[in-house]
Amino acid sequence: MGQVLPLVTRQGDRIAIVSGLRTPFARQATAFHGIPAVDLGKMVVGELLARSEIPAEVIEQLVFGQVVQMPEAPNIAREIVLGTGMNVHTDAYSVSRACATSFQAVANVAESLMAGTIRAGIAGGADSSSVLPIGVSKKLARVLVDVNKARTMSQRLKLFSRLRLRDLMPVPPAVAEYSTGLRMGDTAEQMAKTYGITREQQDALAHRSHQRAAQAWSDGKLKEEVMTAFIPPYKQPLAEDNNIRGNSSLADYAKLRPAFDRKHGTVTAANSTPLTDGAAAVILMTESRAKELGLVPLGYLRSYAFTAIDVWQDMLLGPAWSTPLALERAGLTMSDLTLIDMHEAFAAQTLANIQLLGSERFARDVLGRAHATGEVDDSKFNVLGGSIAYGHPFAATGARMITQTLHELRRRGGGFGLVTACAAGGLGAAIVVEAE
């Protein structure tokens, strides 16, 4: 076991998570169509503060993330402060770590708490895949800049004459890695082939995710942590996630064609997480501040870890890399965990990471560790379903997972939970939480 790194303040206070909330998650271009991420962020933070009944001045910092950036609101965190009735003096800044963005937001607020610069803060994220920053071609962008500097009409017309019809076509946000040109689904296909993961295994995991998420909603387990969203023009509220397919069968999954490698692939729309709109946030405090306010924490941060690997091959292995480091810093092993919640970007990616967590060879030859991190106990794994079912508003997923895990730990009488995710750019994140 390596060095244990306790997450405590200089006074010995633990970092408490006192509350968490999210919007329902909606598939692209459905219930939240036309609502930008900044408005989803305001929606969830405003409701979180109202439910917690914490005075606005108690919150000293808000760290929020957004992956699909909107140029007109580059600092989503500050816009949320200004748009929710929070104290205007609240420090606010934005972060981005792809699919692990709200993991980073939580870590940043925790570090402010440990440094003693604040005693309470909010962390979270929001994304909209329905309101996208549609851009212009590089050539058109350059011409427009030059036109703005031109002094005469003839100069402007000459500049415009350089353009061709193709230069005028709108450019949607990139869906591929900037450095490699590979789409996330291409990487998932790589991983399926590298680790021998079959189409049947992927479909089975996706089906499991939907069934468990549907059961969680049916049992009322998510009601406390998901707000009802009232959507302009306020005629139709959204109270539940709208991607979950509780009535599907494995035969339904088998009907879909591969989405990326059309000839030989196994990754489909059904065994991948869909483009999604939504927001999620958590309130963090020092343990003593929570006691002063008479608040009973949902749980506490035990450790966190971030890792990075190469992007050319099998880059979505973040959980296999970050989990052993987070467990080491927490002073725990896999067997100590009550729950394991892994982000399901793709079924292939999820199954590959599960495989490598239990691999002695991977631990020894790749991580340089003496033993495997540990086998993943299916009875502890994604017990309420995962991102394939709920959806994945990129910056919101981490906060959803943390809140969901802490609520489930409390229902089970406490224990330790691991929350982990892969992210674009070969990044990985893992957070260990505990509940009493």
Curated annotation (Swiss-Prot):
InterPro entries the UniProt entry points to: Ac-CoA_C-AcTrfase_FadI, Thiolase, Thiolase-like, Thiolase_acyl_enz_int_AS, Thiolase_AS, Thiolase_C, Thiolase_CS, Thiolase_N
Q: What metabolic or biological pathway is this protein involved in?
A: Lipid metabolism; fatty acid beta-oxidation
Give the stretches traversing the membrane. Answer: none
Please tell me one Gene Ontology term that the record gives under cellular component. Answer: cytosol
CDD domains, A to Z? thiolase (cd00751)
Q: What class of enzyme is it?
A: transferase
The EC number(s) attached to this protein equal 2.3.1.16
Residues forming the catalytic site: C99, H392, C422
The listed locations are: Cytoplasm
**Would the keyword Transit peptide turn up in this protein's UniProt record?**
no
* Keywords, ordered alphabetically: Acyltransferase, Cytoplasm, Fatty acid metabolism, Lipid degradation, Lipid metabolism, Transferase
Q: Where does the protein principally reside?
A: cytoplasm
Q: Name one GO biological process term.
A: fatty acid beta-oxidation
| Single GO MF annotation | acetyl-CoA C-acyltransferase activity
List the catalytic activities from the record: an acyl-CoA + acetyl-CoA = a 3-oxoacyl-CoA + CoA
Q: Which PROSITE patterns match?
A: THIOLASE_1, THIOLASE_2, THIOLASE_3
Pfam families, A to Z: Thiolase_C, Thiolase_N
What does the sequence similarity comment in the record state about its family?
Belongs to the thiolase-like superfamily. Thiolase family.
Its function, per the record, reads: Catalyzes the final step of fatty acid oxidation in which acetyl-CoA is released and the CoA ester of a fatty acid two carbons shorter is formed.
Q: What's the subunit arrangement here?
A: Heterotetramer of two alpha chains (FadJ) and two beta chains (FadI).
Checking NCBIfam families in the record gives:
AcCoA-C-Actrans (TIGR01930), FadI (TIGR02446), PRK08963.1 (NF006516)
Protein name as catalogued: 3-ketoacyl-CoA thiolase
Organism per entry: Escherichia coli O6:H1 (strain CFT073 / ATCC 700928 / UPEC)
What broad taxonomic lineage does this protein's source fall under?
Answer: Bacteria, Pseudomonadati, Pseudomonadota, Gammaproteobacteria, Enterobacterales
Identify the gene encoding this protein: fadI
